[in-house]
Structure formats: C-alpha cells, structure tokens
C-alpha cells in the first residue's frame, strides 16, 4: 500500500509539495516526504553509479578478450595509472595501454565497488520504503479537513426517522430474546467472548443470506475467503499500525512434515477485504474485464486495542464476527472508480432501507482516514434505545494505493506500455452481522418482542417468521428493581435503628420519680 514514487520526483512530473499538503491535511508527519525525497535521490545516484560500474565491468571483459586474442603480453605488474582508477569514467582508450594483468586488477576494483554500491542501494531502498509506507494516499477534494471526527464529520444525508426513542438498548434486548450468552463466552474465549443463541443464530443467517442474494443480483462474484493470511501477503494489504492494534498472529509449523521445526507466521483476517485485495495479486486486468465485483463472506477477528471500556457489554463491539463485504476492482480512468464508489454506498443504503433501519451518511474527516483511503463514507444507523448513531458501514475508495504494492496492473503488459498502470480498488461493508442485529433489535422492539423485518421473514424458521418474543426480563429492569429493594431495605433499617435510639435516650433520662 504505497503511492507512486514518481509523484515525489520533479524530473518525472511529480510535485512533492502536493504530498506534503496531503500529509498536513491528514495531520500526519510532513517530514516523511522530505526524508523520502532525500533517500530516493541517493538511491537514484547509487543506481546510476551501479549502471556505470556494470558498463566498466563489461568493458574490462571485452578489453581482456581482445588482448588475449591478439596474444599481447599478459604482464606481471598490476600497478594502475591514476586515470584507470576512476572506475565510472573508464573508456576503451583508458584500458587500451594497460596489460591484461592491469585490466584484471581494474575489474577486481570494479567488482568491489559494485558490491559496496549494491549494499548502499539496498539500504537506501529499505529506508525509502519505510517512509513511503507511512505516507497516506492523496485525498479527494470533497473530504472534510479536520482532525476532530466527533465535531467535523460532515453529514451528507439521512434516511428514515432518526429521532425515535425506544425503551431498551441492544445490551438488554439480546438477553430478553435469550439470544446471547456473555458470561460463558468470556469464560471460554476471554473478554468480549460470546455465544450467539437460538433466534439470533437464525437472524444472523437470515441477514447473511439476504445480503448475499442482493449482491448476487448485482453481478457480484461470491467468495468465501480464508480466515488467515501469510505474513508477507498481509504486509501488502494492511498498514503497520494494524499489526499492533488489530491483527491476531497465528504461529504454526512450517510444513506438515513431522521433523520440520521451522515456524510459519500467519495473521487472522480483520475483514474479507484483506484476502480479496490479494485475490488478483500479480495479475494484469484488461479494461473490458472491469469493473470486477466481489462479495466476500468471512468470519473476522479484531483485537480492538484502544477500545478498552467501550461497548464492553453485548455484541456490538466483539473480537469475532461475521461480515459480508463489497470489494471492487475498477478502471483508473475517467472517474470510473468514483462512479463505483457512489454505486457501492448506494447498494448498502438500499439494503438498510429495505430492512427499515434509519441512518445517516457521514463524510469522514481527513485526520481519521487510514493511509489507503482517498475518501470514506460511513453509514451510521440510528439506535433508538441507545439514543445514538452507530457505524454499520464504511465505504472507501483507495484508488491505486493498494494495487501498487499488490502489483495488480491495468491494461496491457509493460512491454506494450511506457509505464505500468494500476487498477483502483474499493471496499464497502454490506453487513457486519452482530452490529446489524443490534440495530434491528433496537428499531423493531415492541412490548412483546422483536418484529422480524419483512425481507428476512423468508429466511426465518416456523415460529420466528413474524416476531422474536421476549422470554427473559430486561437486565436493566432487574438492576433497577434490586436498587429499589436495597434502598427500601436500607430505609426500613434506618427507621428501626432510629426507634431503638429514641428508647435508649428515654431510659437514660428517666429519674427515680419517673420510675
């Protein structure tokens, strides 16, 4: 995931100031651009030097061959004149008066210089890449420039009534329908572990089937992806911070051989976007094949580092969940990827409209975008029980930022072109099931239970096609009852203690005559 290096090179038509401005707008380190330009300049010098040295090496070999053919004396002295030690400026005329022994000495010096230059070049290449991978994609002009997501995300539009208030939040409702077991889940899997139960298992499967059916009707190719990826491939689709904050590492044996002691490092996927991005790795895509649409279904795994204390109850923010993802490879020309961007968020909106879930579309501020996204729109559903908007969908156009490192190229092979072009890659959530379940529970709650949204009824079993009935009391009501009971008991105890104290005072104040 990187920008085109030519964007940093003024002699190639690039303008580093444009990228500096992008870094400023992203509220990221601007000095990375200057460090990269310096490293790239030194790298290009090394490559130029290496080219000259290789020419010198070939010249030495040719001169030795000619002298041997002419049977000239080999010579014993390998002392070199000063002009023969200027390796990058060697010419046939410089080598002509030298003996074979002297030219062989020149070739040894050239080999040593090549080795040092290659070492310097590789070091600079690694340094340049470290800077490059931390510089974000160019921003779309419509992105709001701010580092305050809460205050400055721009609401583009809303759908449905986003003012409705209802009694219970999803935290209570998952318990009331007996569709969730959190305590046992935490014992088995640790924090945020859970078992989905009974009616919510069916509701989740209904959402999956309905979402896939819609995407299939829109010419998406369905993919059930691997759940883990090799480290070297994951490095091409995930930014560095994700390895520390989001991804789970899996360690296994290097092969299936019993005597193999090597270690194989893999990473659990955080979204099916990651394996689908690599699905066409190293391929050339013809213009007439685009756009290529994929609908990814997978379990997703996220560490949620930095989310301590947020959404600790219920199933809204968990370490493991099912998700259907839209992923598209698009042409880099004529704004085609931006047309696809609008289509993808429109597909997601249509899905939630048919479910009857109110929402708003939010344009995310520059400072909150990941490196790859040129622009991101979120669909935030209205949760009437929680009295809040919560994110259900993220739709991003990453332009050619991801494709470059994955080497997914556009058009003809490089032999037919001056320079390889890369496809544009876009992703958008269709349905993260646990979050959508939470939204359905809050929006469709009644006194008796949860009304099943019309499009999902066909996927639900007999007895659950119309309503998922409440079978347990709301935890919040039980907590309130306990508090009230405790307060009442405390009041009685205080009153009783107060009566005893009055009696003791009277006894102490009694005189002999009183008795």
Curated annotation (Swiss-Prot):
Top EC class for this record: ligase
Segments of this protein annotated with the region Interaction with tRNA: 9-61
Annotated Gene Ontology cellular component terms: cytosol; nucleus
Organism the protein comes from: Danio rerio
E.C. no: 6.1.1.11
Comp. bias regions, Basic and acidic residues: 479-507
Annotated site residue numbers, Important for serine binding: 429
Protein name: Serine--tRNA ligase, cytoplasmic
Role of this protein: Catalyzes the attachment of serine to tRNA(Ser) in a two-step reaction: serine is first activated by ATP to form Ser-AMP and then transferred to the acceptor end of tRNA(Ser). Is probably also able to aminoacylate tRNA(Sec) with serine, to form the misacylated tRNA L-seryl-tRNA(Sec), which will be further converted into selenocysteinyl-tRNA(Sec). In the nucleus, binds to the vegfa core promoter and prevents myc binding and transcriptional activation by myc. Thereby inhibits the production of vegfa and sprouting angiogenesis mediated by vegfa.
Free-text comment on this protein's domains from its UniProt entry: Consists of two distinct domains, a catalytic core and a N-terminal extension that is involved in tRNA binding.
Chief localisation class: cytoplasm
């Amino acid at each position: 995931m990187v920008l085109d290096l030519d964007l940093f090179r003024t002699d190639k038509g690039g303008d580093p100031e444009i990228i500096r401005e992008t870094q400023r707008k992203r509220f990221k380190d601007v000095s990375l651009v200057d460090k990269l330009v310096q490293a790239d300049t030194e790298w290009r010098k090394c490559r130029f030097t290496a080219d000259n040295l290789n020419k010198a090496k070939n010249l030495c070999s040719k001169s030795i061959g000619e002298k041997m053919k002419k049977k000239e004396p080999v010579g014993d002295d390998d002392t070199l004149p000063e002009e023969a030690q200027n390796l990058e400026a060697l010419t046939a005329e410089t080598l002509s008066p030298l003996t074979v022994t002297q030219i062989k000495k020149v070739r040894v010096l050239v080999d040593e210089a090549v080795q040092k230059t290659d070492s310097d070049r590789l070091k600079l290449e690694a340094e340049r890449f470290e800077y490059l991978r931390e510089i974000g994609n160019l921003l779309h002009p419509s992105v709001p420039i701010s580092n305050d997501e809460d205050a400055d995300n721009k609401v583009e539009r809303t759908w449905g009534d986003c003012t409705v208030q209802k009694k219970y939040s999803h935290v209570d409702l998952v318990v009331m329908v007996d569709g969730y077991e959190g305590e046992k889940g935490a014992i088995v899997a640790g924090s945020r572990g859970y078992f989905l139960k009974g009616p919510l298992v069916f509701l989740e499967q209904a959402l999956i089937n309905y979402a896939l059916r819609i995407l299939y009707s829109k010419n998406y190719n369905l993919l059930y992806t691997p759940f883990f990826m090799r480290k070297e491939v994951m490095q091409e689709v995930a930014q560095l911070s994700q390895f520390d904050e989001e991804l789970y590492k899996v360690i296994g044996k290097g092969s299936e051989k019993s005597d193999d002691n090597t270690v194989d490092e893999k990473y659990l996927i955080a979204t099916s976007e990651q394996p689908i991005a690599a699905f066409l790795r190293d391929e050339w895509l013809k213009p007439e094949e685009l756009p290529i649409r994929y609908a990814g279904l997978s379990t997703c795994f996220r560490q949620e580092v930095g989310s301590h204390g947020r959404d600790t109850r219920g199933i809204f923010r968990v370490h493991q969940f099912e998700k259907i993802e839209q992923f598209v490879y698009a042409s880099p020309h004529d704004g085609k990827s931006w047309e696809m961007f609008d289509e993808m968020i429109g597909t997601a909106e249509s899905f939630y409209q048919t479910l009857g879930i109110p929402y708003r579309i939010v344009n995310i501020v520059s400072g909150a975008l990941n490196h790859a996204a040129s622009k991101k729109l979120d669909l935030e559903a209205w949760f009437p029980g929680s009295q809040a908007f919560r994110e259900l969908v993220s739709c991003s156009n990453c332009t050619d930022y991801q494709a470059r490192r994955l080497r997914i190229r556009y058009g003809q092979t490089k032999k037919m072109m001056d320079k390889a072009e890369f496809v544009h890659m876009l992703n958008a959530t269709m349905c993260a099931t646990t979050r959508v379940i939470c939204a359905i529970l809050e929006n469709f709650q009644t006194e008796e239970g949860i009304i099943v949204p019309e499009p999902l009824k066909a996927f639900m079993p007999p007895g659950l096609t119309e309503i998922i009935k409440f079978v347990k009391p709301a935890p919040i009501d039980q907590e309130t009852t306990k508090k009230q009971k405790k307060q009442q008991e405390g009041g009685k105890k205080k009153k009783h203690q107060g009566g005893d104290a009055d009696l003791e005072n009277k006894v102490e104040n009694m005189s002999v005559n009183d008795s």
